[in-house]
Amino acid sequence: MARKHAIWRFITLIGTVYCSSQVEHYDTFELEPGDQIILFPFIFKGNNIIALSTTRYRDLDRKRTYLVEDVIDFLGSISHVIWNFTVGRIVCADDNRFQRSFDEIMEGYLKEISLDATKIYMKGNKSFGELLEMIYERMFKFNDKRGNYILKYGSDITKKANDMIEDMPHDLDKKKKEEWEVFLNGIKKCGESFRDTEKWRQLIELEKIACNACKEICLDLKEEELMGLFAEGIMRKSLKVKLGEDEISSRGYLEYITISAKVLLGARKEHGGEVMKELVMQMLLGKKGEEIDKRYVDRVAGVVRERQRRREREIEKNMKELLRDEEKAKSKKKGKKKSVGVSEAKEEEKKESGTEEVEASEEVGIPSVEVGGARRKTGKKSKGDQKRFKIHSRVLRWRKSPEKIKEEWDRGSEERWKGRSLEEIKEQKIVHDITGVLELLRSEDADRFFMDAGEHMKGGSERQRMVAIGALETGGQRMTGVVEVGTFKDGDGCPVVYHLRFRPTSIGSIGDVINPGVVEASDVGRVDEGEECEDADKFVYPKGVRFETVKETGSFQIVWKNPSDTSEVLRRLIVYCRPCVI
């Protein structure tokens, strides 16, 4: 009679999230008819990506042995991860007959697939995305051998559900009996659906779409663009929200999206590869599956078409410029050979040159330029269009000479900076002396570049953090990373920039860099809010320092030049625009 009071729980799609080789969490997903779960071909551990869609075994950093071990450990249970997302487990309290059925029929088969996949990956011929496609094919593509496992399991759980309905206790009250019948009929329906080969074919097809699109995204985007994509979207997605930071902080996992199979397959048939790539990119940026319908697909297709037209116009424009340059070169050669008509040729060349300048100014907006801290204005701008910031003295300090900086830090209150060598100070000045970024931060376009990285309390003050993806070129080297801005509000409510630096990082570590918890732990302890602050719009560099800020369509640059020879670029910081969300 113990069974009478048992709590039955039937999970139609994902019952278990596998992290490494252990069951860590049970959860349920609400799916509409026709929806499917797609897995993205990126392996995460905690906040960070440890394998991209294009990552092969030979690409893994051998110096970071723990990273290689994490990937291989995750692959050891990859088939269980896929099964639990796409098919699910039947979990019944106080009765393990469905679990026994799974263990007897599917467990060994799934383990074999994971083991074979791990061996294939370690040979180095397949990327992770290609491996994921292969595993889906092996698990769900029916043939005489493989199809039998799923069909046998479906038949077995159907039979067990029937037996349980027939064996239901006679003294069970009517309401409880109806509940049991609903649950058990649901299990029967699930088992019977395993015979639907079209369902499995569709599942394979959808995963191929995701894997192919992610491969193209990884191959087409530059490193800094990929960093922007991952920082902006995928690491804030569904699984992280469902399980929480603590649950996945040291676990391997895949992110997913629930989407209408009909909409996605229809989009591929109607629009093709470029639109599918953009759709998947929007998913990675955080677009929810329920928001992706036919109307949204058409909107994305329109954006892609317009982008292609712009590229074609740009190519056509460049071709015209090349032809014009060739004509100029020919005119000059003819002018040298002829002794007559020289002045006319020069006059024609001058007219041609003048026309070119007019066309260029019409096509390209004139960038705002700041030289040596004094802005050279190219157009009127109301004060209301700019945000007001103050700069804390600890940030202003970095504009001084290394010797002066060291002297001030050594007698200051921040222990982390005391006793640093002059060489260390010089290195740190390169990544901290970037106050020109405030020109962008104050502008109306700031939100197109900076993303909100959260707030936290520390040292008695509430602090806000913003980050932007960037690249720093110095000493013949190019480093990708993020521009970090930390602020608190003074007594008047004005944001004070107390932290400003370029932090070199990679795609694999971008999660920790933007994670609020990690930032709070490493943030400076106490900031003296009474120290000298300066209005950002009044800030100028010391005499003799030369830099320019140039704002373009997709980037903002700060260029430091040699004061003695301004043709020589000493350092360049590029801040990139955030990915476009449609």
Curated annotation (Swiss-Prot):
Residues 330-339 have a biased composition (Basic residues). The lineage of its organism: Eukaryota, Fungi, Fungi incertae sedis, Microsporidia, Unikaryonidae. This is UPF0329 protein ECU07_0070. Pfam families: DUF1609, DUF3654. Transmembrane segments: none annotated. Residues 344-354 have a biased composition (Basic and acidic residues). Belongs to the UPF0329 family. Residues 326-386 are annotated as: Disordered. It comes from the Eukaryota.
